[in-house]
Amino acid sequence: MQVLVRDNNVDQALRVLKKKMQREGIFREMKQRKAYEKPSVRKAREKAEAVRRARKQARKTAIREGLIAAPKPKARPVSPRRPAAPAPASSPVGAA
């Protein structure tokens, strides 16, 4: 996998690399290969993943054809703005 580093901005290049690796599924595969997985467990996992993919595809098709209503987008919480910095308290000159 190759990433361009522009203007010596290594942080941005690392972010791009991580995003590419995430998209390719490398992190998931590394996690799976960390320990041995029995063939029977692997087969069961792959079957469950296939069922999940088929359900997702069927749901998307049904939404596209209008058979079921599309889910409402989640309302994003509005974060309160920071209050303006209070003006420094000015003390009266004569008060002590």
From Swiss-Prot:
Cellular component, GO annotation: ribonucleoprotein complex; ribosome
Matching Pfam families: Ribosomal_S21
GO biological process: translation
Location of the region described as Disordered in the Swiss-Prot/TrEMBL record: 52-96
A GO term for molecular function: structural constituent of ribosome
Biased composition (Low complexity): 69-96
Keyword Ribosomal protein attributed: yes
Domain of life, per lineage: Bacteria
UniProt keyword terms in alphabetical order: Ribonucleoprotein, Ribosomal protein
Family: Belongs to the bacterial ribosomal protein bS21 family.
NCBIfam families in the record: S21p (TIGR00030)
Name the record gives this protein: Small ribosomal subunit protein bS21
Organism the protein comes from: Methylobacterium nodulans (strain LMG 21967 / CNCM I-2342 / ORS 2060)
